[in-house]
Amino acid sequence: MRMEHLQLGQLGTNCYIVANEYGAFVIDPACDAQVILRKAEEMGVKIDTVVLTHGHYDHIAAADELGLEMVHLHEKEEMLYLNPEYNLSGHFGAAFFGKKQCVLLKDGDAFMGFTVIHTPGHTPGGICLYNEEEKMLFSGDTLFCAGYGRTDFPGGDFDELVKSLSKLNRMKSDYHMYPGHGEILLNRRKK
């Protein structure tokens, strides 16, 4: 498995390009589709699809510009992708209406060699993606190296976030964590 990391947009959103035996996909195409496509070309891969850890604008802004037919996201996150009131695009001076076909994911689904973990709280349909063999967790805005996602946006729920963090805390702790913002944490260990 190969992975490249890009930090994009006003908020320094972490965007990841992952290539494995299932194909190549982008996690959270924050903005600037051309930068993402150039990085994929440097990797020698053609991006097959997009997956969104959640539907906030700083994670979806380039989703419709990558020339792909569909995006994958949790079934409870579709309203954020489609509705600028919920995806917060107005805060960035835009009005983003998702235009791609949505493939709806659920907790426990397999996606391109990863397991989907539903982690509501920051948003209703937030997800993490976990690959046990590679010990990789893409945590979106659920969990960061030094904190967790905010819950004061529409659809946020602190009690749900606490449950999601507890779910992640029960996992094996020696995974590499790739969050939606900030530093990547290699070999996470419980303290």
Task: Label the predicted regions.
Residues 1-43, 128-140:
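Conserved beta-strand hairpin/beta-sheet module of binuclear metal-dependent hydrolase folds
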Residues 3, 17-19, 107-131:
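Core dinuclear metal-dependent hydrolase active-site scaffold
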Residues 6-7, 100-102, 117-120:
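Short Gly/Pro-enriched turn/cap motifs at secondary-structure boundaries
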Residues 18, 61-68, 109-111, 165-172, ...:
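Alpha-helix C-terminal capping segments
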Residues 24, 50, 70, 137, ...:
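Hydrophobic "anchor" residues on beta-strands that sit immediately upstream
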Residues 32-111:
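Active-site HxH/HxHxD metal-binding segment of metal-dependent hydrolases
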Residues 61, 114, 155-156:
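Residue-level signal for the nucleotide or nucleotide-sugar donor/cofactor binding architecture
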Residues 118, 123-191:
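Metallo-beta-lactamase
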